[in-house]
Swiss-Prot record:
GO molecular function: proton-transporting ATP synthase activity, rotational mechanism
GO CC, alphabetical: chloroplast thylakoid membrane; plasma membrane; proton-transporting ATP synthase complex
Protein name per Swiss-Prot or TrEMBL: ATP synthase subunit a, chloroplastic
Keywords of the record: ATP synthesis, CF(0), Chloroplast, Hydrogen ion transport, Ion transport, Membrane, Plastid, Thylakoid, Transmembrane, Transmembrane helix, Transport
Species of origin: Pelargonium hortorum
Length: 248
């Protein structure tokens, strides 16, 4: 119990320190004595509006013979379903909405930063950036994933889920506990680092050379942005499947 308590306290302190990581000048709101990252909320609302608008457009008038738009969204849904089924197994059904939401939010957020350099928008104070450019967003998504796989394991196995911490031998208890903390950290830092680096490269090139020159870098950013969204969603599904099956 002392090991678990120390690990939790250390993890909480680490998350608090991470939340203060800044690159560039952030745009803040003061709400009820709290300092809120306004640029994350603004760009997140833009991303959510794009996703909601696209969803409404896709289901507004479904056809027996699908249109091009309907075909596209059906393909996206099938792709997400296949990823979930491959990683989670036969009980993937209830998790498709969660995995799909993660994938689509991260994908559109990443692409918004790759296609449109938010930092060039002039604000009285601070600057805008893609939602996934902020460590608080990626940590929040990673923690949601952690909650999801704990919930999946406890729902499937009950308290027997915690037997995994002493398998194959109780000596590995500290390492197995540490693994639950390293998973969200690796998820969040991988996504944050890649998206931040991509946006910084594009902004620097735009400030130094004509618009045409950074275009190849922007295309590379689009590719890596899509890959990062897929990696995050795939790992999230794999962690959920692992917690339900009980194997590593």
């Amino acid at each position: 119990m002392n090991i678990l308590s120390c690990s939790i306290n250390t993890f909480k302190e680490l998350l608090y320190d991470i939340s203060g990581v800044e690159v560039g000048q952030h745009f803040y709101w003061q709400i009820g004595g709290f300092q809120v990252h306004g640029q994350v909320l603004i760009t997140s609302w833009v991303v959510i509006a794009i996703l909601l608008g696209s969803s409404i457009l896709a289901v507004r008038n479904p056809q027996t013979i699908p249109t091009d738009v309907q075909n596209f969204f059906e393909y996206v849904l099938e792709f997400i379903r296949d990823v979930s089924k491959t990683q989670i197994g036969e009980e993937y059904g209830p998790w498709v909405p969660f995995i799909g939401t993660l994938f689509l939010f991260i994908f559109v957020s990443n692409w918004s930063g790759a296609l449109f350099p938010w930092k060039i928008i002039q604000l009285p104070q601070g600057e805008l950036a893609a939602p996934t450019n902020d460590i608080n967003t990626t940590v929040a998504l990673a923690l949601l994933t952690s909650v999801a796989y704990f919930y999946a394991g406890l729902t499937k196995k009950g308290l027997a889920y915690f037997n995994k911490y002493i398998q194959p031998t109780p000596i590995l208890l500290p390492i197995n506990i540490l693994e639950d903390f390293t998973k969200p950290l690796s998820l969040s830092f991988r996504l944050f680092g890649n998206i931040l680096a991509d946006e910084l490269v594009v902004v620097v090139l735009l400030s130094l050379v004509p618009l045409v020159v950074p275009i190849p870098v922007m295309f590379l950013g689009l590719f890596t942005s899509g890959i990062q969204a897929l990696i995050f969603a795939t790992l999230a599904a794999a962690y959920i499947g692992e917690s339900m099956e009980g194997h590593h």
